[in-house]
Amino acid sequence: MRENRPVIALDFPTLEDVKAFLAKFPADEKLYVKIGMELYYAAGPEIVRYVKELGHSVFLDLKLHDIPNTVKSAMRVLSNLGVDMTNVHAAGGVEMMKAAREGLGEGPILIAVTQLTSTSEEQMRDFQNIQTTLQESVVHYAQKTAEAGLNGVVCSAHEVAKIKEATNQDFVCLTPGIRPAGAAVGDQKRVMTPDDAHQIGSDYIVVGRPITQAEDPVAAYHDIKAQWNDQ
């Protein structure tokens, strides 16, 4: 189920910024983009409709986490927007994840967040009071996500091999925190290069600032895409 296009994180504050960014790409180049909280809360459902009308694929990254019925209802709305992928927090529990799957339907890819890539093992133990290793926590969440009938998880590339071993090889692993070699890591604690993620078995990678803030975003995108596809 591997996606050969890097997913571009559209971390912009307005729809106009998104329009300006996407206009840099040829009209016939269909991208896979991530719309996160900032952009969705600023622009609303219109941002999803706009991007879909251009023919791009959309990962709507809202990380829903609420009681099962509320999440089910919200997912029904997102399904009507035509998103290609969306997510929930695995910490919401198996029943919540099952409700999310029911609300979204079987078409779009539904994944769960395990531990955020900004979370260190020390932070997890101190704040969340989870007294295992970070990897054990992530694998546990992944197993529960599979049990709930979801397609996969958001995880660091460091955990991909263990997750697929604990679930199955078709279980989707989407990896954020991807940086080209030599790029600044920002606020991500656990990062890898596109080639590293390819070699370790990630199915999707998410790349933001190295593309969106590049002097030439189109060239940066194609360079990262080549690294991701080991070309």
Swiss-Prot record:
It holds the Pfam family OMPdecase. GO terms for cellular component: cytosol. It catalyses: orotidine 5'-phosphate + H(+) = UMP + CO2. Keywords: Decarboxylase, Lyase, Pyrimidine biosynthesis. Pathway: Pyrimidine metabolism; UMP biosynthesis via de novo pathway; UMP from orotate: step 2/2. PROSITE patterns: OMPDECASE. Its EC number is 4.1.1.23. GO terms for biological process: 'de novo' pyrimidine nucleobase biosynthetic process; 'de novo' UMP biosynthetic process. The active site is at K63 (proton donor). It comes from the Bacteria. SUPFAM superfamilies: Ribulose-phoshate binding barrel. InterPro entries: Aldolase_TIM (IPR013785), OMPdecase (IPR014732), OMPdecase_AS (IPR018089), OMPdecase_bac (IPR047596), OMPdeCOase_dom (IPR001754), RibuloseP-bd_barrel (IPR011060). Substrate binds at residues 11, 34, 61-70, 117, 179, 188, 208-209. One of its GO terms (molecular function) is orotidine-5'-phosphate decarboxylase activity. Belongs to the OMP decarboxylase family. Type 1 subfamily. Catalyzes the decarboxylation of orotidine 5'-monophosphate (OMP) to uridine 5'-monophosphate (UMP). PANTHER family: OROTIDINE 5'-PHOSPHATE DECARBOXYLASE. Homodimer. HAMAP family: OMPdecase_type1_B. This is Orotidine 5'-phosphate decarboxylase. It comes from Streptococcus thermophilus (strain CNRZ 1066). The gene is pyrF.
